[in-house]
Amino acid sequence: MARKTPLNRIRNIGIAAHIDAGKTTTSERILFYTGVSHKIGEVHDGAATMDWMEQEKERGITITSAATTCFWKDHQINLIDTPGHVDFTIEVERSMRVLDGAVSVFCSVGGVQPQSETVWRQANKYGVPRIVFVNKMDRIGANFYNVENQIKLRLKANPVPINIPIGAEDTFIGVIDLVQMKAIVWNNETMGSKYDVEEIPSDLLEKAKQYREKLVEAVAEQDEALMEKYLGGEELSVEEIKKGIKTGCLNMSLVPMLCGSSFKNKGVQTLLDAVIDYLPAPTEVVDIKGIDPKTEEEVFVKSSDDGEFAGLAFKIMTDPFVGQLTFVRVYRGKLESGSYVYNSTKDKKERVGRLLKMHSNKREDIKEVYAGEICAFVGLKDTLTGDTLCDEKNAVVLERMEFPEPVIHIAVEPKTKADQEKMGVALGKLAEEDPSFRVMTQEETGQTLIGGMGELHLEIIVDRLKREFKVEAEIGQPQVAFRETIRSSVSKEHKYAKQSGGRGQYGHVFIKLEPKEPGSGYEFVNEISGGVIPKEYIPAVDKGIQEAMQNGVLAGYPVVDFKVTLYDGSYHDVDSSEMAFKIAGSMAFKEASRAANPVLLEPMMKVEVEVPEEYMGDVIGDLNRRRGQINSMDDRLGLKIVNAFVPLVEMFGYSTDLRSATQGRGTYSMEFDHYGEVPSNIAKEIVEKRKG
């Protein structure tokens, strides 16, 4: 079976947005106009095809990125729906990794919101070119030009409108295409499937000319030949303008900006045209970096059908009918179902039972998959998110994704004995699917703890336990993931010697402990010279310290951000062993930490609260009581926006308190930002409570 769509006609795109910008509705409309779904699923009545997990239908938010294939004007679009809630940023990171381009959806009323900033940062991190779609132009308070300014100010980007709205709110009927300089007006009777191309209304001609001028200037900057033509007063052709927009979009010096109303079926076809005109094909993005596992040298994987198979597993899902689905982005070569692949991250071979092309919740079996495609593999047992699958003879490890540590833990108890075993299996499966979710057993109490990125994240996990795995579980009070660190440098010596009968134990080390920058982690430096400690014992010292740092001296929390230098010591020909040096390292670290001015750290959340002005005073007072530090206060559409850092431990139950303080009119969002030092009086309480 040969490839159906040439590689240069494939677009792997994601639709990324803030919770209520209308992302799922936009994805739905894309599927409708490209002829995939016959009845449009509305999020308002809980029936969108992309949102296929039960909880998403209830909450009306998108949690798992479903990958869907559709076709538009001889191009194949693989659409990855990304979640917009902060607790699910890991999903967004993951989809960004395998996308070639993105459509950022903004609400014409709400504009740039905190989550939009996070998603924008992630797209910058992975170098994903994007176009902006300003949605909900039919809503009261819709303002396209406002959003344009916010993108400049808040996202520090360069938005260049390629169409502008005709009317707004109730009078929004279409757009002016600035490339063709024509008006496009949608027909309400045909669900927006048909539209008329007309002359630009006279009252908008001036504005259209002004924005066309801005567009042409931005395009001319992309190319010297175009710049000369532009400065010489010559008109640029439609083809030249399109080419310039694409160049700028791909090098990320400009962001093409369009508008519409997905819910009212206006502007979706123009968005699809922009996707195929301006977003990159797999052949137009930078070659993906990888490492040759044998030589550890950097190699580049070029997207093409020639060459050996290479792909990245970016998502794992459990499907009730087929078992485990591993979503893979294929970067190079092709693969047939039933063949073997090599997992270079784990150094294991796996057999691919079936290849499935997903359409949000329907599936189609395919015989083989080619470069540039996104496909679900069935039958892989050991492959996890972020693993590379490739050909064994031409192995490569594509760069790994980085996953954040959980900031909140909750104890879960199965309701019955029968649930006990099922719960262990279920939590294991969920942890495979979601690397930002962790499961552990608390040593002192033997309780099972689950950790994640926020309360909503864990609520959904517990909900999935009940629905998908039929496990009833009780949950405890949320617990915050505190950390410890040191504030001063200390040198310590520890000699571990046991010589009473039989073979003795002897390990002797001198270490220097120093604080490091927040977030920089642990570093071990070996400065032993002249063989005072034999080479084979040095890793044991490092290991001893790494084990000891899991339980800090203050309250038993993990110790972070410090450097240990092993600079001297001694050994015994007969009695020294790895074990002895491990113990010596661990004891030296504990003694040094006690003397190094240890402090407690807590997760600080970046909180943004949006409230009507009359509640502003109460909300700020409340945030101050929660030990928050207010960073800024802004206005957005008649509401006050408060930005603050607040300790996570003070934020439990905040949504209920905010609702009652603002009569349900306040909203907030929060995401983990950094670890901050706990004030000494509060640290004292925490330590006493831990030591019971």
Curated annotation (Swiss-Prot):
Under the cellular component aspect of Gene Ontology, which terms does the record hold? cytoplasm
Q: Which SUPFAM superfamilies match?
A: EF-G C-terminal domain-like, P-loop containing nucleoside triphosphate hydrolases, Ribosomal protein S5 domain 2-like, Translation proteins
Query: One Pfam family this chain carries?
Result: EFG_III
Which residues bind GTP per the record? 17-24, 81-85, 135-138
Q: Which keywords annotate this record?
A: Cytoplasm, Elongation factor, GTP-binding, Nucleotide-binding, Protein biosynthesis
What InterPro entries does this protein's entry cite?
EFG_II, EFG_III, EFG_III/V, EFG_IV, EFG_V, EFG_V-like, EFTu-like_2, G_TR_CS
- What PROSITE patterns does the record point to? G_TR_1, G_TR_2
- Biological-process GO terms, alphabetical: ribosome disassembly
- Domain tr-type G: from-to ranges: 8-283
User: Subcellular location, in the record's words?
Assistant: Cytoplasm
Nucleotide-binding: present as a keyword of the record?
A: yes
Q: Which family does it belong to?
A: Belongs to the TRAFAC class translation factor GTPase superfamily. Classic translation factor GTPase family. EF-G/EF-2 subfamily.
Query: What does the UniProt record say this protein does?
Result: Catalyzes the GTP-dependent ribosomal translocation step during translation elongation. During this step, the ribosome changes from the pre-translocational (PRE) to the post-translocational (POST) state as the newly formed A-site-bound peptidyl-tRNA and P-site-bound deacylated tRNA move to the P and E sites, respectively. Catalyzes the coordinated movement of the two tRNA molecules, the mRNA and conformational changes in the ribosome.
Task: Please name the HAMAP family in this protein's record.
Answer: EF_G_EF_2_B (MF_00054_B)
Q: Spell out the protein name for this chain.
A: Elongation factor G
Q: Which organism is it from?
A: Helicobacter pylori (strain HPAG1)
